[in-house]
Design a protein with these regions (language model features):
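Acidic, Gly/Ser/Thr-rich repeat motifs that build Ca2+-stabilized beta-propeller blades
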Residues: 16-154, 204-207, 254-286, 304-315, ...
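C-terminal motif of bacterial Sec signal peptides marking the signal peptidase cleavage site
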Residues: 11-13
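Beta-propeller domain segments
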Residues: 19, 75, 80-82, 92, ...
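Short, glycine/acidic-rich beta->alpha junctions
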Residues: 31, 136, 189-190, 291
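Intrinsically disordered, low-complexity segments enriched in polar/charged small residues
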Residues: 7-8, 123
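Sec-dependent signal peptide recognition
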Residues: 1-7
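Short, surface-exposed beta-strand/loop micro-motifs that present aromatic residues
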Residues: 142-143, 297-299
Length: 330
C-alpha cells in the first residue's frame, strides 16, 4: 500500500532563506527491497539491482525479487555484491543488461562486468567483459551507465589503495569506457571511489565521488583528464589535475552515490549525509537537501518524476520495518 510521506527541504546558498516545510511529497512505490543499488526503468517497470544477488522487478504494486545466476559466488564483504546494473538500449528485444559484481576466488576478491539475460524470471550471466578487477572490502566504485554515444561507462574504485588511482597500468581509481570492439579503455584517472555518473542535456558528463574524510566531489569528466587523487582533493589545485566544481568541504561528508539530472538540477544520492542533495551545476551551489529517509543509494528521473532508493539495510543505517524503500517525489 502506498503511503504519502511529507518531506522537509532545507535551502542552502547565499540567501540562507528557509523554505516552508512539507513543500514536497514522497510516495512509497515499493518496500522491503534488499540493499538496492541501481535503479532502471523500462515501459513503466522498474528493474533494481540488489546487493544480495537479485533484481527487484517492480510492476505497479507487484514486487518480485528475481535470482541472478552468476558464474562465481558473490562476495559478502562490507561494500561488495551485485552493484552496478543498466539495461542495454535494446533490452526490449534482447532482455539483456550489463552488471558489475564482486566475487571471491581463492581467498581474494575481484570485480567484473558482465552481460545478463532475463529468461523465465531469472537473470543468467552470458558474457564476461572485464574480469579480475582487483578489490578489497571497500571502494568498489561500480556504477554503470550508457552514455549519449551509446557506449558503456564504468566507475572503478581504488580498492582501498590510493596508489592505484595514479597507476596507469591499473583500472582501479578510473572511469573506463567500452569501445565498439568490446575492449575497455581508461577514460579518466585519479579517482578514489566514484559512484555516480550522469550526462547534462548538453552532453557534459558529471561524476560523484567519495572523498577521504569529507571532501566529497562533483566533477565534470573529460576524456584523458586526471582528477588528482590522492595528490589533491576537495578544493585543492595543482597544475595537471582537475579540481571539482562542487565539494562538501573538509568538515562535511555526503558519501555521494547515484546521480541524475531532473528538470535542470543535479540530484545526488547521499549515504552518510542521509539526503538527496539538489545542486545547481551552473552556480556550484547545493540548493536543497531532502532528508528524513536515512541513507540514499540511487536516484532516477523518468523526465516527469524523481525516484530514489534508501540503503538503510546495508549494515550502516537504521532500518524501519519497510526498508529498503523506493520513493517517488512529487
Amino acid at each position: 500500500m502506498k503511503r504519502l510521506i511529507l518531506l522537509s527541504l532545507i535551502l542552502f546558498g547565499c540567501s540562507q532563506e528557509a523554505i516552508e516545510p512539507e513543500k514536497e511529497i514522497a510516495e512509497k512505490v515499493a518496500t522491503n527491497l534488499d540493499i538496492p543499488w541501481s535503479i532502471n526503468q523500462q515501459d513503466g517497470i522498474f528493474y533494481i539491482s540488489e546487493r544480495v544477488g537479485t533484481i527487484a522487478v517492480i510492476d505497479g504494486a507487484t514486487v518480485t525479487h528475481e535470482e541472478v545466476l552468476l558464474s562465481d559466488k558473490l562476495s559478502s564483504a562490507s561494500e561488495a555484491g551485485l552493484l552496478g546494473f543498466v539495461l542495454k538500449p535494446d533490452f526490449q528485444e534482447t532482455k539483456e543488461a550489463f552488471a558489475y559484481y564482486t566475487y571471491d576466488l581463492n581467498g581474494e576478491s575481484f570485480n567484473r562486468v558482465v552481460t545478463l539475460k532475463r529468461e523465465n524470471k531469472k537473470w543468467h550471466e552470458m558474457q564476461i567483459h572485464i574480469d579480475k578487477i582487483k578489490t578489497g572490502n571497500i571502494h568498489h566504485g561500480g556504477r554503470l551507465e550508457i552514455g549519449p554515444d551509446g557506449k558503456l561507462y564504468v566507475t572503478i574504485g581504488d580498492a582501498g589503495d590510493p596508489n592505484n588511482s595514479q597507476d596507469d597500468t591499473s583500472m582501479n581509481g578510473k572511469i573506463v569506457r567500452m569501445e565498439d570492439n568490446g575492449s575497455f579503455k581508461i577514460f579518466s584517472t585519479g579517482h578514489r571511489n566514484p559512484q555516480g555518473l550522469a550526462w547534462h542535456e548538453n552532453g557534459t558528463l558529471f561524476e560523484a565521488e567519495h572523498g577521504q574524510s569529507a571532501n566529497d566531489e562533483i566533477n565534470i569528466i573529460e576524456q584523458g583528464k586526471n582528477y588528482g587523487y590522492p595528490i589533491i582533493e576537495g578544493n585543492e589545485t595543482k597544475d595537471g589535475y582537475v579540481t571539482p566544481i562542487i565539494t562538501s568541504g573538509s568538515s562535511e561528508t555526503w558519501a555521494p552515490s547515484g546521480i541524475t539530472f531532473h528538470k535542470g538540477k543535479l540530484y545526488v544520492a547521499s549515504l552518510r549525509g542521509e539526503a538527496v542533495k539538489v545542486m545547481n551545476v551552473e552556480t556550484g551551489n547545493v540548493e536543497q537537501s531532502i532528508t528524513g529517509f536515512g541513507r540514499v543509494r540511487d536516484v532516477f528521473s523518468d523526465g516527469e518524476a524523481l525516484y530514489f532508493v534508501t540503503n538503510n539495510t546495508d549494515g550502516r543505517g537504521n532500518p524501519s520495518e519497510d526498508d529498503d524503500i523506493l520513493y517517488k517525489l512529487k
